[in-house]
Design a protein with these regions (language model features):
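Short, conserved DNA-binding cores of transcription-related domains
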Residues: 2-89, 167
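RNase H-like nuclease fold core
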Residues: 74-79, 86-92, 125-126, 131-226, ...
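Metal-dependent DNA phosphodiester-chemistry modules and their immediately adjacent helices/loops
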Residues: 84, 257-291
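DNA-recognition alpha helix
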Residues: 113-124
Length: 396
């Protein structure tokens, strides 16, 4: 009698084992998150205790890439205290840096040897350069999913926007096209990249489309939008977020004034302008601005005086918000630093073959910086804003 031979499908077994490990990792990490929350609050969920510190306020989901695969973390929300977990810091998402490397290889035209070396470092085995195109398609899908993800950070009181120009091929001709970028500080005080999208130029139509896209994905609770006074942006803010206030970036405002000031007088004008925004109230800043305008006219800098006189009010909106936040909401330096990092990477490419490749590289960099540099570092203490929301000047 012949014995039956059982054939095992190695790929199926590997897949099942991988899913078993992934599920175990996911379950363990979520249990650790709950333990961390219990330790911080000094009480279990639903437990009544005199020693309790803070209160539970549900959960929010966050995807995390581990060596065992993608897992979904159910991160506890706490009221009355911040929850800064070491779990996410330790197992921070690695996907973005991998995708960025793939896209850079594809766009920068790296050598075959470098492609082999990098792919071996990333996946443990050398990948033929012939497969790079397929790998990039996969990376594009992941980044596009991230770019269009629902915004789940609750409310976003402070939003920073800017445009970065990249050179790309457009119907056989090369021209500069704007990539519009937005980041925000959420209600818990953490920075978050909201998104990036290509706009033919920084005009009202592009900004309206961009803001509507963000709002459609869940951007809510906006109190202040910080940015440069580029064409059409202020009108777009009023149309899409009528209850939000607009803060013109003071750094961009200064540069605009410097454009009509002789180089020999820039240093003294810098001190004059900074003195306006060093005041302790909007009223004092307005009075200082009037004095600066008069002084500029006395220095025969009539154009500079007019720019200050016409534009100063838009730069003082930050005074309507908690003074503890002033230094971080009167400029969009937080997004400018991101843009410098993006330019450093895109400079290697030079001219992009199309808008999609440019946008994907920008998004990959944004995601990488947010994941690796921002992490769980709180950017602002939002209790100051919560305490001020009863003020009609902020509530709008």
């Amino acid at each position: 009698m012949s014995e039956k031979i059982v054939q095992l499908n190695e790929e199926i077994i590997k897949g099942q084992l991988k899913e078993l490990v992934r599920g175990s990792v996911e379950e363990t990490l979520n249990e650790l998150l709950e333990k961390e929350a219990e330790s911080l609050t000094q009480a279990a969920r639903y437990e009544r205790s005199e020693a309790r510190q803070g209160y539970r306020s549900g959960h929010y989901d966050r995807n995390l890439t581990t060596t065992s695969g993608d897992v979904t973390l159910h991160v506890p929300r706490l009221k009355g205290m911040s929850f800064e977990t070491a779990i996410i810091e330790r197992y921070r998402r690695r996907e973005s840096s991998v995708e960025e490397a793939l896209i850079e290889m594809y766009l920068a035209g790296v050598s075959v040897r470098r492609v082999e070396d990098i792919t071996e470092a990333l996946w443990g085995s050398k990948v033929s350069p012939a497969t790079i195109s397929e790998l990039n398609k996969k990376a594009y899908v992941h980044i596009e999913d991230w770019r269009n993800r629902p915004l789940q950070g609750g409310r976003y009181p402070y939003v920073y926007v800017d445009g970065i120009y990249l050179r790309r091929n457009w119907c056989g001709e090369y021209e500069n096209v704007a990539v519009l970028v937005a980041i925000a500080v959420n209600e818990d005080g953490f920075r978050e990249v909201l998104g990036a999208a290509e706009g033919m130029k920084e005009d009202k139509a592009s900004w309206v489309s961009f803001f509507q896209w963000l709002r459609g994905r869940g951007l809510d609770g906006v109190k202040l939008i910080v940015g440069d006074k580029c064409m059409g942006m202020l009108e777009a803010v009023c149309e899409v977020f009528p209850d939000a206030k607009y803060q013109r970036c003071t750094v961009h405002f200064y540069r605009n004034v410097f454009s009509v000031v002789p180089k020999s007088k820039v240093k003294i004008v810098v001190k004059m302008l900074k003195a306006i925004h060093a005041q302790e109230s909007k009223k004092a800043s307005r009075e200082k601005a009037k004095a600066v305008v008069a002084e500029l006219r006395a220095m025969k800098l009539k154009e500079a005086a007019k720019k200050v006189e016409d534009g100063i009010e838009e730069t003082l909106t930050y005074c309507d918000f908690p003074s503890e936040h002033w230094t971080r909401i009167r400029t969009n330096n937080v997004i400018e630093r991101l843009n410098r990092e993006i330019r450093r990477r895109t400079r290697v490419v030079g001219t992009f073959p199309d808008g999609n490749s440019a946008l994907m590289l920008v998004c990959a960099r944004l995601r990488h910086v947010a994941d690796t540099q921002w992490g769980n570092k709180k950017y602002m203490n939002m209790k100051h804003l919560e305490a001020a929301l009863d003020d009609a000047s902020i509530a709008g």
